[in-house]
Amino acid sequence: MEKFTKLTGVAAPMPVVNIDTDMIIPKDYLKTIKRTGLGKGLFAESRYLEDGSPNPDFVLNKPAYQNAQILVAGDNFGCGSSREHAPWALLDFGIRCVISTSFADIFYNNCFKNGILPVVVSPENLEKLLDDASRGSNAVLSIDLERQEISGPDGGTITFEIDEFKRHCMLNGLDDIGLTLEHAGAIDTFEKANASVRPWA
């Protein structure tokens, strides 16, 4: 998993509450277990018109936001079913950070496992960040995970809280496999000791 230390990128405003995983990645794209290639299905029902052409009114289709790496979204982002395809689609599109006032628990945890940083801010700070993100290609935010700060285009900063263990995993690029490998030496020592006292096991 790619490390997340500091990200500076265009932030796209999506001030919609209760964006669920069905909206993030429709069921038609769930037939694969590959993590790549799902970016084309991200927000597909809103992003494309009936004829399959891009919807010019959808935020991620607008020239200023086509390379967005940050989403600033409404409350309760990622609610609905627990499909892990949702963070896969966000990551494949290029989104590395989602900022909201709250997230559905399963989606929130799945983000950390897939290298996406979900940041919780107050309603007041979300409004400020949405205003920043509405500046088009000038809507550049910097997310500093080490300092736990968001810097806006005007130079102002917003601090955020994050679980220390999750922060450690993101800073070091550790998914479940990476965490296991961190303790490979201890696991090997235990297995050798266990084999000597329980050779039948």
Curated annotation (Swiss-Prot):
Record InterPro entries: 3-IsopropMal_deHydase_ssu, Aconitase/3IPM_dehydase_swvl, AconitaseA/IPMdHydase_ssu_swvl, IPMI_Swivel, LeuD
PANTHER family for the chain: 3-ISOPROPYLMALATE DEHYDRATASE SMALL SUBUNIT, 3-ISOPROPYLMALATE DEHYDRATASE SMALL SUBUNIT 2-RELATED-RELATED
Catalyzed reactions per annotation: (2R,3S)-3-isopropylmalate = (2S)-2-isopropylmalate
Organism: Agrobacterium fabrum (strain C58 / ATCC 33970) (Agrobacterium tumefaciens (strain C58))
A molecular function GO annotation: 3-isopropylmalate dehydratase activity
Oligomer and partners: Heterodimer of LeuC and LeuD.
Any one of the GO BP annotations: L-leucine biosynthetic process
Amino-acid biosynthesis found in the keyword field: yes
Record EC number: 4.2.1.33
Recorded metabolic or biological pathway in which this protein acts: Amino-acid biosynthesis; L-leucine biosynthesis; L-leucine from 3-methyl-2-oxobutanoate: step 2/4
Pfam family, one: Aconitase_C
Cellular-component GO terms for this entry: 3-isopropylmalate dehydratase complex
Keywords, comma-separated and alphabetical: Amino-acid biosynthesis, Branched-chain amino acid biosynthesis, Leucine biosynthesis, Lyase
SUPFAM superfamilies: LeuD/IlvD-like
Function: Catalyzes the isomerization between 2-isopropylmalate and 3-isopropylmalate, via the formation of 2-isopropylmaleate.
UniProt protein name: 3-isopropylmalate dehydratase small subunit
Family membership: Belongs to the LeuD family. LeuD type 1 subfamily.
Broad class of enzyme this protein falls into: lyase
Top-level taxonomic group: Bacteria
Keyword Nuclease: no
